[in-house]
């Protein structure tokens, strides 16, 4: 059995995926997770294919499999919240496109908080939003990350995520 071990690494405008691979290799990792921009805002740079291809070569040379790499969605999205719903769906569609451009098939997402809403309504928003995001037949799987359950966070248990 081969262990797959990694951590969060950076992804900056200059070195992009190549820099992420280099950082993971410095840690001795064979996988990693990253944000395609700062997790607290919507600023995203243009993905440069030539850097991505260099990253692929470095990954191949070091036995890092692309299917094990994960993008983490930014914290500013909240599919639960009616007021942030449209923004969140649109921004996550862009993140899915960025994943596809990088060849990455997994996007991790915090479901969000139900601020001022019934929990069932918030969960229905998550389901509706995910269906809208994934309706284009893309190859990216959205992975819901469990939450600590503090305050109005949704997704504190597997039962809640499997709603």
Which residues are covered by each model-predicted region?
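N-terminal pre-domain/capping segments
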Residues: 1-73, 78-97
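Active-site acidic/histidine proton-transfer and metal-coordination neighborhood
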Residues: 78-163
